[in-house]
Design a protein with these regions (language model features):
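Conserved short alpha-helical segments that host acidic/polar catalytic motifs at enzyme active sites
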Residues: 2-258, 263-322, 328, 416
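Flexible loop/turn segments at secondary-structure boundaries
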Residues: 44-46, 122-123, 153, 223-224, ...
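Secondary-structure transition/capping motifs at alpha-helix termini
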Residues: 166, 186-187, 319-323, 341-348, ...
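A conserved beta-strand->alpha-helix junction
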Residues: 170, 175, 347-358, 455-473
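Phosphate/diphosphate-binding loops
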Residues: 195, 243-244, 251-252, 256-260, ...
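PRPP-dependent phosphoribosyltransferase catalytic core
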Residues: 197, 212-213, 249-255, 276, ...
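Active-site proximal loops enriched in glycine and acidic residues that flank catalytic Cys/His/Asp
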Residues: 218, 240, 266, 327-330, ...
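Short, glycine/charge-rich flexible loops or terminal/linker lids adjacent to PRPP-binding catalytic cores
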Residues: 344-389, 400, 427-437
Length: 514
């Protein structure tokens, strides 16, 4: 049975703690998932991991963490908040100094490898116990794990191992993976990690840190991105997005293949398949629409170019006479520029974000939410007053904050508001790593476009078609059939009759004590 190393075995330094903070409600409609990073053999690996996470901060802002090894011991640090809050200069120095677990003496052995994680929770609450990487002792040694995705059979697996006497310290699906790896069934296999991954159902891009190596793995469907790169000195690195590799001066080599485990060690890069890739892949198209950095190259395309193409296609599908094309900051900018270019309507920015609002509201009331939205986005009255506007946004989930934004434009004197959305209506929940609301909270679930238009108070509303979206995302290497559109179409690649909702592991613990 694995034991959490934080209470014993490896003394962690007393580090500066960032305060836990909830996020502004308007950001909760569509949440980023997580980012992972790993490097082996590179001098300054701690700093590289820090910058690799910093470059992927858009994928998760609830917590961050890092684990390092000197070839003998593992040391980890996690905390709630942004990367720059969790890792102070003192924190990074402590990780680089590597306290020896026996006597706390400073080791002269250089750091051999590191992995990192920044998180938005999709299974397990936003609590410090769920921050990653998780560092555990088990019969095979010590391991640290960081995960992007969602294991839909995590609750069933946790039930199984609790009945066998395993003790869990968190409510995330990632800890379930560690218990699987530690079990005798997997440890008796010639490839314990591969045997572990074959037991998982769902989406995962993971990095594992052992004393002598980093291992990176991706599920057979390829839901979440994971890329392999190389530093100028030849040392290997992995990350969720290519933007992280660019930030540290690494060269992108290739994607980690679906069903593949890539090992980074002193022997270089080694590869093995733990499962055959699915015949029909399931690359998350919402990565192109919203989640990924515009600067990343993902699923065969540069994200910025995909988003501009989404806007161009939207202009062809839903033309309208207007004075200006206006983006909803920040995620609507790329599509709005494409719409303006294809339509010939001038591009103007009349909605200005206040970047200093959004992370200090703790459990706001509805009145506070409304005020927060007004503070978050300021309307330039002289630009919008008396004008017919095409407002472009990437998506609508619940619709309440979109309505508030449209009310602001109307109050500022906009003559007409034509809302254009660069993806189809989101009608179904995601069980594979995106924190979409339940069906009854999705505004497009069992509602027509006209009903949504009336609720939002706009003059016209159009969503991009699924076909138009896939035409923009697809490439010769990744044709349209290899993208997951379940949140739009309900076409799930795996059986989700009994899916694992985000809070299922918390509810299980509450039942135990009720």
């Amino acid at each position: 049975v694995p034991n959490r190393t934080r209470p014993r075995s490896i003394p962690l330094p007393v580090l500066d703690a960032a305060p836990a903070r909830d996020f502004l409600a308007e950001d909760s409609e569509k949440k980023e998932k997580c980012a992972v990073f790993g490097v082996w053999g590179e001098p300054g690996g701690v700093r590289l991991t820090y910058w690799g996470l910093y470059a992927q901060q858009h994928r998760g802002q609830e917590s961050a963490g890092m684990a390092v090894t000197d070839g003998d011991h593992l040391l980890g640090h996690t905390g709630m908040g942004l990367v720059a809050e969790v890792f102070t200069e003192r924190t990074l120095w402590d990780l680089e100094a590597r306290p020896d677990r026996r006597n706390g003496a400073r080791s002269a052995t250089p750091i051999r490898g590191a992995i990192g994680h920044c998180r938005y929770s999709t299974t397990g609450a936003s609590l410090s116990c769920n921050a990653q990487p998780i560092v555990e002792n088990y019969i095979g040694g010590t391991v640290a794990v960081a995960h992007n995705g969602n294991i839909i059979n995590a609750s069933l697996l946790r039930d199984l191992y609790e009945q066998k006497g395993h003790i869990f310290h968190s409510t995330s699906d990632t800890e379930v993976v560690v218990h699987l790896l530690a079990s005798p069934e997997q440890q008796s296999s010639p490839d314990p990690l591969g045997a572990t991954l074959r037991r998982l159902q769902g989406a995962f891009s993971m990095v594992f840190l052992f004393p002598d190596r980093v291992e990176a793995a991706r599920d057979p469907w390829g839901w979440r991105p994971l890329v392999l790169g190389e530093m100028p000195g030849g040392h290997p690195v992995v990350a969720s997005e290519t933007v992280a590799l660019d930030a540290i001066g690494a060269t992108t080599i290739r994607d980690v293949r679906p069903g593949e485990i890539v090992t980074l060690s002193d022997r270089g890069v080694e590869s093995r398949q733990f499962a055959e890739p699915a015949e029909r892949r399931a690359h998350c198209v919402f990565e192109h629409v919203y989640f990924a950095s515009p600067a990343s190259h993902l699923f065969g395309r540069t994200v910025q170019l995909v988003r501009e193409a989404l806007g161009e296609t939207l202009a062809k599908e839903a033309p309208v006479d207007a004075d200006y094309v206006m983006p909803m900051p920040d995620s609507g900018r790329s599509a709005a520029s494409g719409y303006a270019r294809a339509s010939g309507i001038p591009y103007r920015e009349g909605i200005v974000p206040n970047r200093y609002v959004g992370r200090t509201f703790i459990k706001p009331t509805q009145d506070e939410r409304t005020t927060a939205v007004r503070l978050k986005l300021n309307i330039v009255g002289e630009i919008v007053r008396g004008k017919r506007l095409v407002v472009v946004d990437d998506s609508i989930v619940r619709g309440t904050t979109t309505r508030a934004k449209m009310d602001q434009l109307r109050a500022a004197g906009a003559k007409e508001i034509h809302l254009r959305i660069s993806c189809p209506p989101i009608k179904h929940p995601c069980y594979f790593g995106v924190d979409f609301a339940t069906r009854d909270q999705l505004i497009a679930h069992e509602r027509s476009v006209e009903e949504i238009r009336k609720f939002l108070g706009v003059d016209s509303l159009h969503f991009l078609s699924i076909e138009g979206m896939l035409e923009c995302s697809a490439s010769a290497k990744f044709p349209a059939e290899h993208f997951c559109t379940a949140c739009y179409s309900g076409d799930y690649r795996l059986d989700v009759e009994q899916p694992a909702p985000k809070g299922i592991l918390e509810r299980r613990q509450l039942k135990m004590f009720s």
